[in-house]
Amino acid sequence: MTATNNIVNLYQPFLDYALTKLKEELELQPYPIPSGFEHKVAMTGKGKKQQEVQTTSYAHCSPKLRQIRAAHVQGGSALQVLNFVIFPHLNYDLPFFGADLVSLPGGHLIALDMQPLFRDNLQYQKKYTEPIWETFQKHQKYLPWGGDFPEEATPFFSPAFLWTRPQKTELVETRVFEAFKDYLQAYLIFVKQTEQITNSEKLAEIKEAQLRYLRYRAEKDPARKMLTRFYGHEWTEEYIHGFLFDLERKLALNPA
């Protein structure tokens, strides 16, 4: 397989692994993908530089997880993206599982985390950050801190946030893939161990924290500019608010 083919299909093994693992470990059910968002194709560039860009969406749910969704963007050797996020139901204090994997001609941007509901709460850190700290340190040795990151985003990422910019595709295929597997496996352990929250005050805090996270992500989505260029403003905004970060829409239809 050539280097170009490696880049073109770079994140398919990640997606295949995650979906297979989740189906093995959880009672998965289909999660509705709004019409028009399952698969979208656009052509970019001109002449010999013309390139097809495909965006494919995947979505499931389980008894404890409200939405498990992936957006897989394939644009040849110029662009490969996998955005894989898990949103818990509002009656669990689980963090979000977040994987943003982006590959461009100049290198790779990798973000893996258990994104916390209550980042600065020490009990929450003890419950959801300490158990993965050793895993984080193991992978950070080979995947060092990627540098500049928006300060305003800090509340939405844990101390075990793996943010790195590897230059070599081989590192993505090996070290990043192993980190992805380890973080997902750790998350599944959290899911199995977590118990339903019944305290009304705590439930209100969870709902507020989830909405705060989703509003920030929807407003600051780094893929907005790229998707708008490929598919237009209207499609992109509806994709972001109606699928990628859809909690407010869902609550409007069925208030919790």
UniProtKB/Swiss-Prot annotation:
First-tier enzyme category under EC: oxidoreductase
GO terms assigned for molecular function: cobalt ion binding; phycoerythrobilin:ferredoxin oxidoreductase activity
The enzyme's E.C. designation: 1.3.7.3
GO biological process, one term: phytochromobilin biosynthetic process
Oxidoreductase keyword on record: yes
Domain of life: Bacteria
InterPro entries, per the entry: Ferredoxin-dep_bilin_Rdtase (IPR009249), Phycoerythrobilin_Fdx_Rdtase (IPR022827)
Catalytic activity: (3Z)-phycoerythrobilin + oxidized 2[4Fe-4S]-[ferredoxin] = 15,16-dihydrobiliverdin + reduced 2[4Fe-4S]-[ferredoxin] + 2 H(+)
Keyword tags: Oxidoreductase
NCBIfam families: PRK13250.1 (NF009723)
Sequence similarity: Belongs to the HY2 family.
Function in brief: Catalyzes the two-electron reduction of the C2 and C3(1) diene system of 15,16-dihydrobiliverdin.
Protein name: Phycoerythrobilin:ferredoxin oxidoreductase
Provenance organism: Trichodesmium erythraeum (strain IMS101)
